[in-house]
A protein has these predicted regions:
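C-terminal hydrophobic helical "lid"/dimerization subdomain
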Residues: 71, 115-166
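Mid-domain Rossmann-like dinucleotide-binding core that forms the NAD(H)/NADP(H) cofactor-binding site
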Residues: 1-45, 50
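A short acidic, Gly/Pro-enriched loop at the edge of an enzyme's catalytic core
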Residues: 51-58
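Short glycine-centered segments of the SAM/dcSAM-binding site in methyltransferase folds
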Residues: 81-83, 106
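N-terminal Rossmann-like NAD(P) cofactor-binding module of classical short-chain dehydrogenase/reductase
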Residues: 58-61, 84
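Helix-to-beta-strand junctions that scaffold the AdoMet/dcAdoMet cofactor pocket
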Residues: 77-79
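Rossmann-fold NAD(P)-binding glycine/threonine-rich loop
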Residues: 87-103, 115-123
Length: 166
């Protein structure tokens, strides 16, 4: 689970919500659990059904920039749920509008926060209520860090360090 997903888990818990974290990697699901996720589900063909067995989703926030998550979200959502898309897949995304209309789903896009929301998030972080998983990488290893990011191997956020940090 990437950095945005990790923050989302924590913010949802602070808001009193039940959180079901979804990811393709077991280690990232384990991290989500330590950050407060109530349940963790492996992102595979049965994920939507598994989420329904847990009571279904009243809302889904998708940070993954891939189209493969769309059918899973539709299967996971209860009637009148809201789906928030923040990850932007390359190319077009096709789906059956019938499911959205018939079940009264709301699909929203979100790309940024405003100053007030950022200030609130920073205050939560400064108070230790929201934690980031940070991977410090020397600038000389920027290419390796980018390869790891593209391969989905990075948990949280990667921060490039300049010079000697010892």
């Amino acid at each position: 689970m990437g950095g945005l997903g990790q923050y989302c888990v924590q913010l949802a818990k602070l808001s009193g919500l039940r959180v079901i974290a979804v990811d393709v990697a077991d280690d990232k699901l384990a991290t989500a659990k330590t950050l407060g996720a109530d349940e963790c589900v492996k992102a595979d063909e049965g994920a939507g059904a598994a989420i329904q067995e847990l009571g279904g989703a009243h809302g889904c926030v998708n940070f993954a920039p891939v189209t493969a998550t769309w059918p899973m979200m539709l299967d996971a959502c209860n009637p009148r749920a809201t789906i928030v898309l923040t990850g932007v897949p390359a190319g077009e995304m096709a789906f059956y509008t019938y499911q959205v209309v018939e079940r009264g789903l709301m699909v929203r896009g979100s790309s940024a926060s405003n100053r007030q929301e950022m200030a609130e998030l920073l205050a939560l972080a400064a108070g230790g209520r929201v934690k980031g998983v940070i991977n410090a990488v020397p600038f000389a290893q920027i290419n390796e860090a980018l390869l790891d990011l593209n391969a989905g191997k990075v948990e949280g956020r990667t921060v490039l360090t300049m010079g000697d940090t010892s």
